[in-house]
């Protein structure tokens, strides 16, 4: 590796070093000034991809996959804290650090995989938004998918009001989703003992190929590659002293608190989704268990709710789904910009970047809709496959993150502690082994 020299461009230059922080007030005031980037990252942990994998996990295997959500969320907290340290201590995002650390041909391969991961993320957002538009307004899935092309202009409009406003809008939408699902799980009345037992490890997760497939989907939907790139960049939006070790340490401390708080909320939402799927569907013999349409119809026809309340709750569910898809669009756009600028130093207009990504993402969806005659179950299956691809792509983000954050020449006193190295390498190795096992099993069953 080359010696680190601060010659790289600023990450996301338009928001870099633009948000003031409180360094002399009370603890709560200091923390509040850092709250925000974690919200944008948490969005990726509760996007439509999480919805379908968590709901299908609950519907097909009851509560046993709650342990996977817990493990994934704790792992995510550690990994996001590593991206925070990388961004604040070096002034580089993960894409820039990867390019800096690897030789050009290898970095190019990693860039392609990062771009494909962002497209896979976008597929989930398009499908979720298209289904929400169908549920709310009866818009055909094909038309709904095409309509999502125009949300490319959403971020451009919101960005005019400043980065802090984006954080506030995203936070409001996340809170809305949380409240909706807390109430819906309350109505579904799951058995508390069974839910708590779901957090205990079960061998079924490994021995049952179906459970392993959904478990990897949950991991892929929870620990998302684009979030690692995103977080390492947007933490640099705060106006800490770039030349002060003490100021950087202060920023890392509060940015990590922000991250852990928001990821805890995302953890709760994902658990609620799985519990909802299990409470309504586990043991029910249907062709497609725990899909968006199934859950929407179940809420609408839930005897406990009655006709009027059922209609309200199913509509709220669809609104939350649409909000989730749009939230993820905001962060996906930023991540795409970070990856393209960081790896190949190519700056193109945001609207064009977004349009290219969205058009590529829509292509497999349109093919799926045409070939399977707008079959809803096939759309939801495509979404699950997109999440499994994210799980396969994850090591290509994790390995550069691990190598970069453990390099003293790059990180100085902020390099990884021994326990961080042990856990992060274990995560990378275990995930890689599970991925290889899954691929072998999948091909054997073809």
From Swiss-Prot:
Keywords: Cell membrane, Ion transport, Membrane, Symport, Transmembrane, Transmembrane helix, Transport
MF annotations from Gene Ontology: cadmium ion transmembrane transporter activity; manganese ion transmembrane transporter activity; metal ion binding; symporter activity
Tagged with keyword Phosphoprotein: no
The organism's place on the tree of life at top rank: Bacteria
A GO biological process held by the record: iron ion transmembrane transport
Subcellular location field: Cell membrane
Membrane-spanning segments: 32-52, 59-79, 107-127, 139-159, 168-188, 210-230, 264-284, 303-323, 355-375, 381-401, 420-440
Major location category of this protein: membrane
GO cellular component, one term: plasma membrane
Membrane topology listed for this record: Multi-pass membrane protein
Keyword Ion transport (UniProt): yes
Annotated Pfam families: Nramp
Similarity comment: family membership: Belongs to the NRAMP family.
Xref: PANTHER family: NATURAL RESISTANCE-ASSOCIATED MACROPHAGE PROTEIN 2, SOLUTE CARRIER PROTEIN FAMILY 11 MEMBER
Functional note: H(+)-stimulated, divalent metal cation uptake system.
Protein name as it appears in the record: Divalent metal cation transporter MntH
Gene encoding the protein: mntH
């Amino acid at each position: 590796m080359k010696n680190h020299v601060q010659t790289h461009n600023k990450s996301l230059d338009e928001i870099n070093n633009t948000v003031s922080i409180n360094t002399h007030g009370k603890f709560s005031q200091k923390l509040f000034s850092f709250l925000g980037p974690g919200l944008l990252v948490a969005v990726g942990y509760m996007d439509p991809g999480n919805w379908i994998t968590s709901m299908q996990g609950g519907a097909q295997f009851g509560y046993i996959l709650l342990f996977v959500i817990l493990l994934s969320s704790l792992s995510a907290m550690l990994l996001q804290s590593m991206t925070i340290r990388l961004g604040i201590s070096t002034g580089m995002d993960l894409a820039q650090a990867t390019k800096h650390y690897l030789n050009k041909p290898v970095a190019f391969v990693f860039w392609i995989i990062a771009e494909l991961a962002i497209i896979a993320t976008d597929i989930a957002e398009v499908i979720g938004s298209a289904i929400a538009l169908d549920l709310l307004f009866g818009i055909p899935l094909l038309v709904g998918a095409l309509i999502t092309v125009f949300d490319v202009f959403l971020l451009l409009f919101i960005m005019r009001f400043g980065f802090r406003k984006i954080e506030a809008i995203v936070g409001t939408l996340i809170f809305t989703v949380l409240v909706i699902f807390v109430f819906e799980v309350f109505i579904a009345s799951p058995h508390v003992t069974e839910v708590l037992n779901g957090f205990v490890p079960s061998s079924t997760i490994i021995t049952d190929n179906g459970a392993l497939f959904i478990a990897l989907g949950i991991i892929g939907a929870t620990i998302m590659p684009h979030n690692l790139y995103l977080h390492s960049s947007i933490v640099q939006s705060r106006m800490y002293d770039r030349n002060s070790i003490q100021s950087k340490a202060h920023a890392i401390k509060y940015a990590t608190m922000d991250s852990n708080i928001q990821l805890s909320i995302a953890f709760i939402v994902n658990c609620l989704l799985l519990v909802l799927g299990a409470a309504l569907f586990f043991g029910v013999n249907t062709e497609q268990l725990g899909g968006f349409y199934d859950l929407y119809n179940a809420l609408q026809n839930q005897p406990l709710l009655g006709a009027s309340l059922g209609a309200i709750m199913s509509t709220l569910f669809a609104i939350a789904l649409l909000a989730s898809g749009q939230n993820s669009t905001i962060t996906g756009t930023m991540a795409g910009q970070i990856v393209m600028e960081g790896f190949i130093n190519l700056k193109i207009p945001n609207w064009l970047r977004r349009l290219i990504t969205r058009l590529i993402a829509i292509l497999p969806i349109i093919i799926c809709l045409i070939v399977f005659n707008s079959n809803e179950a096939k759309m939801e299956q495509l979404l699950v496959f997109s999440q499994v691809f994210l799980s396969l792509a994850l090591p290509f983000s994790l390995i550069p993150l691990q190598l970069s954050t453990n390099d003293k020449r790059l990180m100085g006193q902020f390099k990884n502690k021994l326990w961080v190295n042990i856990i992060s390498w274990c995560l990378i190795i275990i995930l890689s082994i599970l991925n290889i096992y899954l691929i072998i099993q999948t091909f054997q069953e073809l």
